[in-house]
Amino acid sequence: MNIYAVGGAIRDDLLGVPVQDRDYVVVGATPEQMVAQGFRPVGKDFPVFLHPDTQEEYALARTERKTAAGYHGFQFYFAPDVTLDEDLARRDLTINAMAREVSPEGALVGPVIDPFDGQADLHARVFRHVGDAFVEDPVRILRIARFAARFADFTVADDTLALMRRMVDAGEADALVAERVWQEIARGLMEAKPSRMFAVLRECGALARVLPEVDALWGVPQRADYHPEVDTGVHVMMVVDYAAKQGYSLPVRFAALTHDLGKATTPADVLPRHVGHEGRSVELIKPLCERLRVPNECRDLALVVAREHGNLHRVMEMGAAALVRFFERSDALRKPARFAEMLQACESDARGRLGLDTQPYPQAERLRVALVAARSVDAGAIARGVGDDVMQIKDAVHRARVEAVKQALAIGE
């Protein structure tokens, strides 16, 4: 048998990018031989094994044939007679269809095996499909878009983009399971330039199928005095990219993506103003998250950011009582960590605008100082001093928090 490192590990090594983990293909072996050498079988649809020492995954070389629509509609063939080139031919992109042999000690040996000119495409910074079988797996649309977010200076080859459009037109994107859509979108959001993912999805028409709420934002105008970039879709991409540049978490980046969804449903006769878009955004985020099975922490932050980001931008105008009400409404007193992420998302919103990416955002510091003061109030001690009347306790605690915030910010009211 021969063992090869394949795919992303070879690509990243050639690019000079740190290799996170490796995928291995075994040619000329049977499942029984793998087990005899101590490998543990874990594959469900095709033979994948864990190395007895490193626990890395090793897959037997295989070919695959499309048998039904969607992500799971494949029939796999694996046997000792499947060659390395045949295994590489089933892969999505030429830059992912390269291999190097692995020595018994685990070192890469010999030249790069590159039957589809992946090295040339790496040099040209091009995503190019390996063959016509590319159209058989709709997940590849999402994967290419995600790769675009990681390798932002790459472009999609014209013929590859044409195939992606054909797949979308044929309804293949509609067959994607929700969990896989979210998985790829989430991974793309965590790359260096998430806007590139959405640009590729828009180019091939897939964004309108998997995230129609986001796709609808392009072409929706905003007031130029607040948004020099004008177009809502452009603004949202700038917000997401700003959040990525700051290294913010997935919940923050998802909130950045969804905070203005309601602007797409603003009546045409009131544009470019968007009165009430916050509430409309909330009503769009809820079914989106349910449809894609978005994790609760992402959904909850997105909802509070969508509802409150306009208010948060205006906190410099708020007195102590209004600030405490804002904290109570956004659950900041009980969930300060989530509130910190809310500040990050709103700061990204303020700076994700043409020419305004370095503008001061004093709202964040004002809220941090005020929240520390409000949370310093000992609600338990106040409750013990007031008695059993719940409303009296709430009122006394609220007044104490207002006074604490007033003193912390030296606000005269």
Swiss-Prot record:
Cofactor annotation: Mg(2+); Ni(2+)
Quaternary organization: Monomer. Can also form homodimers and oligomers.
GO biological process: RNA repair; tRNA 3'-terminal CCA addition
Note on cofactor: Magnesium is required for nucleotidyltransferase activity. Nickel for phosphatase activity.
Family affiliation: Belongs to the tRNA nucleotidyltransferase/poly(A) polymerase family. Bacterial CCA-adding enzyme type 1 subfamily.
Keyword Lipid metabolism recorded: no
Keyword entries, A-Z: ATP-binding, Hydrolase, Magnesium, Metal-binding, Multifunctional enzyme, Nickel, Nucleotide-binding, Nucleotidyltransferase, RNA repair, RNA-binding, Transferase, tRNA processing
Domain writeup: Comprises two domains: an N-terminal domain containing the nucleotidyltransferase activity and a C-terminal HD domain associated with both phosphodiesterase and phosphatase activities.
Domain HD: residue ranges: 232-333
EC number: 2.7.7.72, 3.1.3.-, 3.1.4.-
Misc. comment: A single active site specifically recognizes both ATP and CTP and is responsible for their addition.
Protein name, as recorded: Multifunctional CCA protein
HAMAP family: CCA_bact_type1 (MF_01261)
Recorded GO MF terms: ATP binding; CCA tRNA nucleotidyltransferase activity; cyclic-nucleotide phosphodiesterase activity; magnesium ion binding; phosphatase activity; tRNA binding
Reaction it catalyzes: a tRNA precursor + 2 CTP + ATP = a tRNA with a 3' CCA end + 3 diphosphate; a tRNA with a 3' CCA end + 2 CTP + ATP = a tRNA with a 3' CCACCA end + 3 diphosphate
Binding site for CTP: G8, R11, R91, R143, R146
Taxonomic source organism: Burkholderia ambifaria (strain ATCC BAA-244 / DSM 16087 / CCUG 44356 / LMG 19182 / AMMD)
Residue positions binding ATP: G8, R11, R91, R143, R146
